[in-house]
């Protein structure tokens, strides 16, 4: 298996936005904002690129610049475990170029505006990458891939909580069929929290100074969402390449 990639999106959501998110989005938006496994492939990532470019803080001129801007860890930290003679296998960007056409970019911008008009203001995006070497090292230490996935989600939630500047509400897709998530917390371990409920359908936790976290079976597959009450929502999705 390739690296684990976990992505989080921060949005400001009011009561109207909560109603928007509680039902199906308009068909035109769903055509471009849905399960990535349905909309994208390894040979066609243009739509994902368009959303990433739309949500980047400043315009970028290359995929490498876009990755650096959106990366939670930053390229320097990600390259650190690499031995020099194999680094090029992961980090060679020669020949890389943007794929999204102007029409796709314009359509995504229109979707973002439409969501804002419905009370869902998309603010920013961050991605965390856990490479195969790190996954193997974690496995050797007794941490399986599902827990590495959960821990990456936690780190992204903390990052976007800092960006939001207010308590958040996190909603995550179930990870590995776990019910008692507090046993496997990494970045959140040691933090005071109350258990709001733990079960097959969903598990919930409240963290003073951070907000509420829900892990739900009915959340998007392999994903996490974080909401700041009347302020922001973070959605985190995981996938392997």
Indicate residue ranges for each PLM-predicted region.
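RNase H-like, Mg2+-dependent phosphodiesterase core
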Residues: 1-241
